């Protein structure tokens, strides 16, 4: 029988591929989006031949490959949001698709993670899934020691060196001195997340999108992370004429610059979307760090995704608060997962690792839950909130997005659509509202949320939504209007 092994991140396939290749050799096929079309067609045709691969290792798109006799589906790091395809359509979740695929073939499904998603853990608690808990780490290595550092207090006492606390610098210095490695985690790429006039507070924004621009020092340009448009860095403020234009905040590029000044002897690598655009760049970064050619890795959430490096003894989480301050009901859950996963990179083999967690709010419950690895506490606390406010795992969410070039048309159409939806779904419909980023690539956006209790007739819901979309399409005022749905959004 065949096995499908799904991973959330292409970077992970490199590490696991080497391990599986040692066992399965030519029986192993790899499939992900960094491969060329020709390479992917080749794998597809091999799957249709009389001698398909026995094991397919891949990112989310591998779930659509043809199989002859599928016996097992493994979804590693099942909590990862990367399994959800956002744009463009189809907006599917590879975990859900894989579970359906396994059902079609009568195959077994295995979900693996140290920090389960609320939905999966709830299903396990309800007896819908089986639950197996591994109480000890591989080879009995202890979980890392997590040291919480109050950066607000240190800033007040003028003891911070940029974004680095003295505790973090001391730990990194010690690790490098002993021939160990360190990882610094900052979930913002670029040099400075924002540029601002020091005199009047003017902030340059993208002309196509409703977002401020990020400074990328390596190319000396301001970049929009939504449409990719670049702008020259202004030398003077168009608002007040001041030449004091400053970068605000810390992106991975700036962290890299500053840490290189503090540790000039360190061999530093940076892992984010900008440094891993090609397949080779990914593989080279991981190989260099695995083999010790680099000893200090700075990265965004990519570094949290199940990578396994023997010599990492210190992990620094530079700004825990940035993960919590999102207008999203899953912010706490995601922050816990991200911090727990990043922490798990420390002390993989042999001795116990150390994690320095920098925050302005050390008393937040989620910080304590990360320190004590208390997933159960987090789960129970969040579950009650979700039940009260009608969120997953008790309700399904559908986000309805309305887009148009003109804001007025977008506003009007979204209100009309909302009225139609309310006639069917009543108080389950919320909105329309402007999302956090209300304009992307010159298109204005409105968002409507539908909350549906579990067990509702999905076929009927689908028919209603299709009908609503067709009705709007018939209206001559809304010829260029775009409407699309995101079911179970993340």
What do these predicted ranges mean?
Residues 419, 427, 490:
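Conserved beta/loop motifs at nucleotide-recognition and modification sites
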Residues 1-54, 58-411, 419, 423, ...:
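Inter-lobe coupling/hinge segments of SF2-like helicase ATPases
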Residues 438-440, 458-459:
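Short active-site-adjacent structural elements
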């Amino acid at each position: 029988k065949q096995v499908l092994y799904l991973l959330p991140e292409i970077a992970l396939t490199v590490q696991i591929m080497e391990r599986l290749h040692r066992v399965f050799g030519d029986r192993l096929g790899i499939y992900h989006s960094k491969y060329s079309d020709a390479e992917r067609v080749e794998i597809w045709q091999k799957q249709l031949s009389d001698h398909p691969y026995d094991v397919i290792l891949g990112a989310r798109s591998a779930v659509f490959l043809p199989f002859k006799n599928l016996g097992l589906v493994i979804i590693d790091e099942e909590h990862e949001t990367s399994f959800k395809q956002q744009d463009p359509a189809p907006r599917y979740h590879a975990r859900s698709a894989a579970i359906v695929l396994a059902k079609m073939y009568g195959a077994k499904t295995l979900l693996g993670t140290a920090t389960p998603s609320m939905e999966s853990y709830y299903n396990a608690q309800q007896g819908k899934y089986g639950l197996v808990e591994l109480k000890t780490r591989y080879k009995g290595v202890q979980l890392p020691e997590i040291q919480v550092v109050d950066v607000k207090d240190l800033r007040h006492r003028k003891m911070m060196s940029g974004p680095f606390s003295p505790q973090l610098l001391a730990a990194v210095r010690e690790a490098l001195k002993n021939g160990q490695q360190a990882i610094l985690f900052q979930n913002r790429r670029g040099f400075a997340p924002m540029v601002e006039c020091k005199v009047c507070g003017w902030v340059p924004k993208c002309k196509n999108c409703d977002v401020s621009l990020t400074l990328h020092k390596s190319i000396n340009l301001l970049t929009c992370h939504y449409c990719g448009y670049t702008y020259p860095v202004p030398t003077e403020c168009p608002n007040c004429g001041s030449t004091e234009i400053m970068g605000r905040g810390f992106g991975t590029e700036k962290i890299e610059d500053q840490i290189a000044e503090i540790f000039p002897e360190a061999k530093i690598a940076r892992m984010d979307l900008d440094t891993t655009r090609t397949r080779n760049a990914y593989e080279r970064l991981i190989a260099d760090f695995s083999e010790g050619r680099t000893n200090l890795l700075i990265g965004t959430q990519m570094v949290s995704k199940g990578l396994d490096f023997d010599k990492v003894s210190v992990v620094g989480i530079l700004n825990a608060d940035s993960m919590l301050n999102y207008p999203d009901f899953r912010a706490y859950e995601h922050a816990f997962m991200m911090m727990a996963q990043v922490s798990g990179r420390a002390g993989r083999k042999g001795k116990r690792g150390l994690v320095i967690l920098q925050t302005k709010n050390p008393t937040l419950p989620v910080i304590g839950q990360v320190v004590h690895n208390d997933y159960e506490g987090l789960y129970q606390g969040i579950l009650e909130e979700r039940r009260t406010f009608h969120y997953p795992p008790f309700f399904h969410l559908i986000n309805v997005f309305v887009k148009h070039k003109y804001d007025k048309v977008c506003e009007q159409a979204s209100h009309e659509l909302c009225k139609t939806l309310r006639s069917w779904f009543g108080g389950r419909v919320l909105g329309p509202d402007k999302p956090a980023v209300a304009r992307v690539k010159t298109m204005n956006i409105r968002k409507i949320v539908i909350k549906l209790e579990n067990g509702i007739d999905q076929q009927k819901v689908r028919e209603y939504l299709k009908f609503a979309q067709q009705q709007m399409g018939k209206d001559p005022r809304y010829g260029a209007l775009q409407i699309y749905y995101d079911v179970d959004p993340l």
